[in-house]
Amino acid sequence: MPPPEDPEDYVAPAAQRVRAGTLLLANTDLLEPTFRRSVIYIVEHNDGGTLGVVLNRPSDTAVYNVLPQWTTLAAKPKTMFIGGPVKRDAALCLATLRVGADPQGAPGLRHVDGRVVMVDLDADPDAIAPLVEGVRIFAGYSGWTIGQLEGEIERDDWIVLSALPSDVLVGPRSDLWGQVLRRQPLPLSLLATHPIDISRN
């Protein structure tokens, strides 16, 4: 009988996998509070470094209190999400395009990957509304310098996986970390059974 497969067998080297539109899932051993069980969507990955936003950290601050003009388009729960520890006083917005929508020529939209776009918060929400299913606004972001993320991946801090457009707008009551793992092949999907409270393990 062959030896059991290791979850790392499904994680390609960082240089082959990390790109705009991929997800970083915090590994079960990453217990630092800022990133524990976090799911990070990569917005940029190039020679200047890597930028992403945490998809599963809602705050208690309503979008209406910060950017009221975007309240209608904001996906539920219509709160600001904590994108990461860098520049918490700056806002970054992602949106999922409607199926079949053509963003070409639309002011204020920049393609990231698939149906996911970055939204210029100075743009007119009414002009963007027909094109998107919703927007998610993040306070701050997560950033890595050149080579830093690759080192963390080699240290097994992160699992690099493909994203679905719906991941960007997932609600706060959903366990996005577990959802992403459960849609992976065995044995990686088994990590989804890892208890939220490690004292129960």
Curated annotation (Swiss-Prot):
It comes from the Bacteria. InterPro entries: AlgH-like. Pfam families: DUF179. GO terms for cellular component: cytosol. Belongs to the UPF0301 (AlgH) family. HAMAP family: UPF0301. PANTHER family: UNCHARACTERIZED PROTEIN YQGE, UPF0301 PROTEIN YQGE. This is UPF0301 protein MAP_0045. It comes from Mycolicibacterium paratuberculosis (strain ATCC BAA-968 / K-10) (Mycobacterium paratuberculosis).
